[in-house]
A protein has these predicted regions:
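N-terminal Rossmann-like NAD(P) cofactor-binding subdomain of oxidoreductases
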Residues: 1-183, 219, 283-284, 288-294, ...
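Charged docking surfaces used in two-component/phosphorelay signaling
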Residues: 66, 155-329
């Protein structure tokens, strides 16, 4: 199987390569694609050197599967071209997510929707992925009526330049500003551009993607905040169900669901934190407690590595699902 990675030198692209090797993903040929400034350079993958190619070369190399993490403009142009050539595409950009022609997939949640006809498959937003991995088993059991989500997101979600801004400010170095304000020792309630309704685009991604993947009947509202941590996204989530619940049953549902690790022992100071989620493919959940202010309501704290499960790992898991279920061709 000929595998192409488009955007192979970026934060997510490098992470995809790492996850592929860790999970022993089976390919016969690896084609690494990056921007013109990187073409001709080499990357070492599993002790083997690979020369970085231009995206145009894919027309000749004809990959069977292409993993895109090079931004919306590249995906908009090249994903349909490759799909017409018979190549399956898994795309990390936002350009196809709300397009009804394409499926938005989290394998633990809706992987079973995939068929051989799906040539372009969209990877959800990082904050949506970790949220819905946790909400899915609870919605099946208790039917979520409303979700209030507040996120606390690492600058790594904005790319390498944003991480550099954080590190430069921490060291007192003047450098390029990705954000309109300093991020070090600050919290920015502003992720992506503001919309006419007063929400940011990031906040609306959480709302719209939850409706597309899980259930359009769930009332969702979100506030997304950028915080000065070098990796990991956190979410404070308040849920209201149509059915009542017992906390022990909630713990049981979450503990027995794939991709979830429950860390919930406040007496021993055990709860999810981004510093401990780094490098993990799991979604961590804790601070699980009944909301005493509203009937049938629950509070949760969800943490995950946004570059792993929030991007690279979910992409690779979709690819694994295609292979395991003979959907690739």
């Amino acid at each position: 199987m000929r595998l192409a990675i488009i955007g192979s030198t970026g934060l997510v692209g490098r992470q995809i390569i790492e996850v592929l090797i860790e999970r022993k993903f089976n390919f016969s040929e690896l084609i690494l694609v990056a921007s013109k400034k990187s073409v001709g350079n080499t990357l070492i993958v599993a002790d083997k050197s690979y020369k970085i190619c231009s995206i145009d070369s894919l027309l000749e190399k004809k990959p069977d599967l292409a993993l895109f993490s090079a931004g919306s403009n590249i995906s908009l142009k090249w994903a349909p071209i490759l799909a017409k050539l018979g190549c399956k595409v898994i795309d990390n950009s936002s350009c196809w997510r709300m397009d009804d022609r394409y499926k938005l997939i989290i394998p633990e949640v809706n992987g079973s929707e995939l068929t051989k006809k799906d040539m372009i498959i969209s990877n959800p937003n990082c904050s949506t992925i970790q949220l819905l991995v946790v909400l899915f088993p609870l919605h099946k059991k208790y039917n979520i009526e409303r979700a209030v989500v507040s996120t606390y997101q690492s600058p790594s979600g904005s790319g390498e330049k944003a991480i550099n801004q954080l590190f430069n400010e921490e060291q007192g170095v003047v450098g390029e500003m990705v954000y309109p304000h300093p991020i070090y020792r600050n919290a920015l309630p502003h992720i992506d551009v503001f919309q006419e309704n007063g929400y940011t685009k990031e906040e609306m991604k959480i709302v719209n993607e939850t409706h597309k993947i899980l259930d359009k009947k769930i009332n969702v509202t979100a506030t997304a905040v950028r915080v000065p941590i070098d990796g990991g996204h956190c979410e404070s989530v308040n849920l209201t169900f149509s059915s009542d619940f017992e906390i022990d049953n909630i713990l049981g549902e979450l503990s027995n669901s794939p991709g979830i690790v429950v860390k919930d022992n406040v007496e021993k100071n055990v709860y999810p934190m981004p510093i401990y989620s780094k490098g993990s493919d799991d979604v961590f959940v804790g601070r699980i407690r009944r909301d005493f202010s509203l009937a049938k309501s629950l509070n949760l704290w969800i943490v995950s590595d946004n570059l792993r499960k929030g991007a690279a790992t979910n992409t690779v898991q979709i690819a694994e699902y295609l292979l395991e279920n003979n959907i690739l061709k």
